Amino acid sequence: LPSVTEYYRAHTPVREVGPGDIDWDHLFGELRTRWFSTGGIYTSLSDKTANLAVEGMKKAGQYGAGRSFDLNYRSNVEPDKNRARDINREIVPHVEFLVGNQDDFDDALGYETEKVPKDASFEVWLDIYTKMLRQVANDYPNLKYIGTQLRGALSADRINWSAVLYDVESDVV
């Protein structure tokens, strides 16, 4: 049986929460929240959620809180890749730790990379991904770390899966 994932978010209440609705000064100032994280599914729910995420990232940065973002592109939530890219290109300049897989970096930010054969060695994956990670870091100098998953489904039962973390400052993957 084929796998089907349903992302029904059209009437979820959180899509109505927008800029000005959250007391960021209370969260990051008084409560001393140390980390703010969100992702592509949330920011694609509505213009309000996208703008709220940008507002939160900026405010977290003002208070010195860590900021992470999972690109997490889902065409079932936002079928328009250009809209998703526009949103993400506004958010990523305020992020320190960015996460996504190869397809996310393409679909959600517009980085086209060489496709890796599913049965490729880890070294081949790493070489191709390292080029992409360095390009993303060059385009977004605010980033400190970029995480990505290396995944090749050989069959329903066999998947090559690993992950890497790119430390931008030391240029180590």
Locations of regions flagged by a protein language model:
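Conserved N-terminal subdomain of the carbohydrate kinase-like
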Residues: L1-T43, F69
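Active-site beta-loop-alpha junctions enriched in small/polar residues
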Residues: A10, I41, N72-N76, D103, ...
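Short, flexible loop segments at the rims of nucleotide/cofactor-binding pockets, characterized by
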Residues: T12-E16, L45-S46, R74-P79, F122-W125
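Short glycine-rich, flexible loops that bind phosphorylated cofactors or substrates
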Residues: R15-E16, S44-L45, D107, L154-S155
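Active-site glycine-rich loop that binds ribose-phosphate moieties when present
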Residues: E16-W24, N51-E55, K81-I87, D127-K131
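Glycine/threonine-rich flexible loop motifs
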Residues: Y42-N51, L109-G110, V116
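Surface-exposed amphipathic alpha-helices with a cationic face
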Residues: V54-G61, R67, A137
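Conserved phosphate/ATP/ADP-binding segment of small-molecule kinases
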Residues: Y63, V77-S170
